[in-house]
Curated annotation (Swiss-Prot):
The lineage of its organism: Bacteria, Pseudomonadati, Pseudomonadota, Gammaproteobacteria, Chromatiales. Belongs to the Smg family. This is Protein Smg homolog.
Length: 158
């Protein structure tokens, strides 16, 4: 089983993150369950580090105003990791008010912190969903993206 950090994060998000859960399992319990599920210990540790970094960034105000006319220029490294469809998806979310500039930057930061060479559109959606879930006052944006991901029929390219 060749699992990466994003696979661990997606598994955690699908199985253990529930807005209605009152008792959250601790890190050791989760690590044990992830090991039982077959994830490598190193990837589990990196996934928890990724989540801690996300939580630490959540505590810091982003402090930037939205400029509708501003254009985000991606670095070469970001372009390697995020293809045109992924960058277009981020722009789509921002233009539709799902992401503001600060949250977009947080999504990009979390993507760049993963060890993957390139990120698929589905993986980007998952990371965006995780970021929105952890942002205060983003419940509507989270719900919108979640329903788009799970309630819409799959895209078929012909």
């Amino acid at each position: 089983m060749k699992e990466n950090v994003l696979d661990v994060l997606m598994y955690l998000f699908e199985n253990y993150i529930d807005e209605d859960t009152e008792i959250e399992p601790d890190r050791i319990q989760l690590q044990d369950k992830l090991l039982e599920a077959g994830f490598p210990g190193a990837e589990i540790d990196r996934a928890f580090d990724w989540l801690e970094n996300l939580a630490n960034q959540e505590d810091q105000p982003l402090g930037q105003a939205r400029h509708d006319s501003a254009l985000r220029v991606y670095t070469d490294r970001e372009v390697e990791r995020l293809d045109a469809r992924a960058r277009g998806f981020l722009l789509f979310l921002e233009q539709n008010g799902v992401l503001d500039a600060g949250t977009r930057e947080l999504v990009i930061d979390r993507i760049m912190d993963l060890d993957a060479e390139d990120i698929s559109l589905d993986q980007l959606k998952w990371v965006t969903l995780m970021v929105l879930f952890n942002r205060p006052d983003q419940e509507a944006a989270y719900t919108w993206l979640e329903s788009m991901m799970f309630d819409s029929p799959p895209e078929f390219l012909h």
